[in-house]
UniProtKB/Swiss-Prot annotation:
Signal peptide: none annotated. One of its GO terms (cellular component) is mitochondrial [4Fe-4S] assembly complex. Belongs to the HesB/IscA family. Involved in the maturation of mitochondrial 4Fe-4S proteins functioning late in the iron-sulfur cluster assembly pathway. Probably involved in the binding of an intermediate of Fe/S cluster assembly. Fe cation binds at residues 57, 121, 123. One of its GO terms (biological process) is iron-sulfur cluster assembly. This is Iron-sulfur cluster assembly 1 homolog, mitochondrial. Residues 1-12 form a transit peptide. It is found in: Mitochondrion. Interacts with CRY2, but not with CRY1 (in vitro). GO terms for molecular function: 2 iron, 2 sulfur cluster binding; metal ion binding.
Length: 129
């Protein structure tokens, strides 16, 4: 059983140099710290699960949920002591993506800096590849 998490937006990244890595997703130090903080309050969960859903004005949207187990088809990313599981349906859309956590005076959210995105909606919540 999964529990819903926080809001996430996506940004199309142009001219981004891909870093050689075996992981489909890399995490910034800010994202790692926030995930550790979130999981500290949820000891029954082992990590976060990233999925992709069909919704929004541009077609696709990422979802983030707490998870207690790794699904059979999930790809596991372990970085700096945190575990992020990527649902099979989301794996190709996330290749080369950097997951960040951004805070400003009015909001805080996870942001997916994704070089595969062709377009996003005005609010940044949905995208197409």
């Amino acid at each position: 059983m999964s529990a819903s998490l926080v809001r996430a937006t996506v940004r199309a990244v142009s001219k981004r140099k891909l870093q050689p890595t075996r992981a489909a997703l890399t995490l910034t130090p800010s994202a790692v710290n926030k995930i550790k903080q979130l999981l500290k309050d949820k000891p029954e969960h082992v990590g976060l699960k990233v999925g992709v859903r069909t919704r929004g004005c541009n077609g696709l949207s990422y979802s983030l949920e707490y998870t207690k187990t790794k699904g059979d088809a999930d790809e596991e990313v372990i970085q700096d002591g945190v575990r992020v599981f990527i649902e099979k349906k989301a794996q190709l859309t996330l290749l080369g993506t950097e997951m960040d956590y951004v805070e400003d005076k009015l909001s805080s959210e996870f942001v997916f800096n994704n070089p595969n995105i062709k377009g996003t909606c005005g609010c940044g919540e949905s995208f197409n590849v």
